[in-house]
């Protein structure tokens, strides 16, 4: 797991820098000006998703390592992939960007809280005394918050250049995502395969259940169909690289990363399928 531990923080920082390059203050002001859809989305993503994941791991009786790995991916905010697929689905891309941006900034507090609380509920007691909720939050701030802010500053002074090349930035972040998970598969293939069936089923069920649930909740409270599609996708497509980073910072066992690896396989496959369908149409 040594290679993954080294490249995950770098890849995550670059991905978050790419996210920041695509953001402006308008994306945050939109939350204030149109709070209803955002509130529905952020509640589904940050509160409902971890609850559903916890109920699922109890129903499936997952081993502790896989259970906590599932909670790590459920705690992660939406990733850049959700923005791309929202566009493919004719959803509200602006809302998707706002949810991803704000969710990513909140994640430095929410992710450590959810992961450490889940570990306590699941009876995980072998965490090192050197690993604390505050310590993980500070590390996340360095590789999540700082790059996002830096990206926004760069965009502020080179907006025309960044805007004309944002598709290249998105492609690079997509490649980084694939590189991280390719490294996991190459380095820990045998260990991952031994757990993959159980973890893959759990992740697939979580995605389907949560995206369906979020869609119908949004149907009752959000303003329209594009917003429902956006909220549904935001609740099913998390920042897998961030989940890997958190897992490698807290645990030494690859089993904790298997749900994230399974999630990445599903995400890449689904994204490729949607992109192919979009080109065909």
Place the predicted regions along the sequence by residue.
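Hydrophobic transmembrane alpha-helices of secondary-active transporters
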Residues: 8-30, 48-53, 73-81, 145-155, ...
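Entry/N-cap segments of selected transmembrane alpha helices
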Residues: 27-57, 187-218, 256-266
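The feature identifies polytopic integral membrane transport proteins across all domains of life
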Residues: 37-42, 63-75, 92-101, 133, ...
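Small-residue-rich segments of transmembrane alpha-helices in multi-pass membrane proteins
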Residues: 40-51, 102-116, 170-183, 233-245
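Generic transmembrane alpha-helix signature in multi-pass membrane proteins
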Residues: 53-57, 69-72, 80-93, 97-100, ...
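Mid-bilayer segments of alpha-helical transmembrane spans in multi-pass integral membrane proteins
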Residues: 79-83, 104-117, 139-148
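Conserved small/polar residues in nucleotide/adenosyl-binding loops
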Residues: 271-280
């Amino acid at each position: 797991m040594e290679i993954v531990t080294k490249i995950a923080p770098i890849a995550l920082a670059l991905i978050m820098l790419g996210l920041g390059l695509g953001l402006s203050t308008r994306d945050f002001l939109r939350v204030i000006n149109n709070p209803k859809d955002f509130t529905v989305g952020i509640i589904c993503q940050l509160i409902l998703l971890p609850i559903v994941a916890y109920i699922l791991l109890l129903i499936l009786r997952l081993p502790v390592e896989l259970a906590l790995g599932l909670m790590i991916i459920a705690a992660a905010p939406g990733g850049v992939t959700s923005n791309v697929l929202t566009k493919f689905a004719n959803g509200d891309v602006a809302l998707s960007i706002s949810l991803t941006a704000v969710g990513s900034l909140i994640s430095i507090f929410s992710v450590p809280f959810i992961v450490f609380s889940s570990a306590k509920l699941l009876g995980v007691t072998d965490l090192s005394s050197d690993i604390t909720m505050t310590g993980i939050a500070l590390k996340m701030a360095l590789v999540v918050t700082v790059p996002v802010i830096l990206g926004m500053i760069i965009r502020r002074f080179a907006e025309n250049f960044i805007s004309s090349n944002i598709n290249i930035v998105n492609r690079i972040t997509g490649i980084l995502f694939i590189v991280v998970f390719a490294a996991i598969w190459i380095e820990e293939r045998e260990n991952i395969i031994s757990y993959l069936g159980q973890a893959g089923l759990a992740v697939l069920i979580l995605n389907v259940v949560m995206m369906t649930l979020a869609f119908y909740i949004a149907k009752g409270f959000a303003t329209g169909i594009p917003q429902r599609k956006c909220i549904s996708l935001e609740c099913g497509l998390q920042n897998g690289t961030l989940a890997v980073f958190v897992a490698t910072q807290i645990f030494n066992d690859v089993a904790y990363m298997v749900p994230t690896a399974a999630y990445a396989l599903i995400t890449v496959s689904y994204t490729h399928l949607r992109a192919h369908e979009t080109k065909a149409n």
